[in-house]
């Protein structure tokens, strides 16, 4: 029995340079709810941004935000990760040393950057739609850290990920999140463990779901549920962790609804 649906956002529900979700998805989520099936948005994005993306159904779904570092149900934080302050500083300093990249540091309240690059700031605030404050120095931030991400507009696979993996891979988990981001994940936090926590708190069996994803930060989530779909455009090897592939979450869920 399927009790929940969980889906990644970027590259899974949002494709290319799209900044808004397919309106059909909201109708599908409402139909799922009528059948007692709960929808969870699972993303590396911040919670407030996900609420805006899913505005028509924002109070009907749950959220696994910041790649599992922050889970919210019914407006209440279910779980919250934490990354050591000094480690955040080290990563931010390394990003500056590397050059040609930008950091986005997440707290439960908002995002921060010390980048002064106008194109990056415009991309985050207007294209992605994040809440983000600009600081001169990350050491000026006085809130607990739940995630740090690094952006390279030229893509992360060629050099950026290898650089940070070499310097920090033995101290913190590093995953690709979309094509231009790498995320540094709080200890014991990932989409799979976060999803398990949130559905278990709702009295559901974590195996009784359908999950969708396309990147390496989705692997634990895809392995959690009995039924899982990797996008046909997924990163190399991701499909090996899923039971099926699809080119459209909406199309797959429409077919699923027809079986109910």
Kindly give the residue locations of the regions a language model identified.
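Mg2+-dependent phosphoryl-transfer enzymes with acidic/Ser/Thr/Gly-rich catalytic loops
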Residues: 1-4, 22, 183-260
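Asp-based phosphoryl-transfer active-site loop
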Residues: 3-18, 222
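Short, acidic loop-to-helix structural element flanking the phosphoryl-transfer center
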Residues: 19-37, 80-87, 129-132, 188-200, ...
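Active-site phosphate-binding/coordination module
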Residues: 23-119
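Residue-level signal for inorganic ion chemistry
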Residues: 32, 67, 148, 222, ...
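Short active-site oxyanion
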Residues: 36-40, 59-61, 147, 207-209, ...
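Short, structured coil segments at secondary-structure junctions
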Residues: 56-59, 67, 168-170, 224-225, ...
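Conserved acidic, metal-coordinating active-site core of Asp-based
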Residues: 94, 100-212, 220-221, 233
């Amino acid at each position: 029995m399927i009790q929940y649906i969980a889906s990644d956002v970027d590259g899974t529900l949002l494709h290319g340079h799209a900044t808004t979700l397919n309106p059909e998805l909201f109708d599908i989520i409402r139909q799922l709810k009528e059948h007692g099936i709960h929808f969870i948005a699972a993303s590396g994005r911040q919670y407030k941004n996900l609420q805006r993306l899913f505005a028509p159904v924002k109070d009907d779904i749950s959220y696994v935000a910041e790649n599992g570092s922050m889970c919210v149900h019914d407006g209440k934080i279910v779980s919250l990760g934490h990354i050591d302050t000094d480690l955040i500083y080290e990563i931010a300093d390394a990003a500056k040393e590397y050059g040609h990249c930008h950091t986005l540091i997440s707290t439960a309240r908002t995002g921060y950057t010390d980048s002064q690059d106008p194109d990056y700031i415009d991309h985050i605030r207007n294209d992605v739609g994040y809440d983000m404050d600009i600081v001169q120095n990350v050491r000026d931030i006085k809130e607990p850290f739940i995630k740090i991400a690094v952006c390279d507009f030229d893509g992360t696979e060629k050099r950026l990920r290898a650089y940070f993996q070499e310097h920090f891979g033995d101290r913190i988990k590093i995953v690709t999140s979309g094509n231009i981001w790498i995320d540094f994940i709080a200890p014991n936090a990932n989409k799979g463990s976060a999803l398990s926590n949130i559905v278990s708190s709702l009295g559901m069996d974590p195996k009784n779901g359908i999950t969708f994803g396309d990147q390496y930060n989705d692997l634990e989530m895809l392995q959690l549920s009995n039924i899982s779909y990797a996008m046909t455009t997924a990163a190399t090897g991701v499909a090996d962790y899923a039971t099926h592939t699809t080119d459209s979450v909406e199309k797959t869920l429409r077919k699923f609804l027809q079986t109910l």
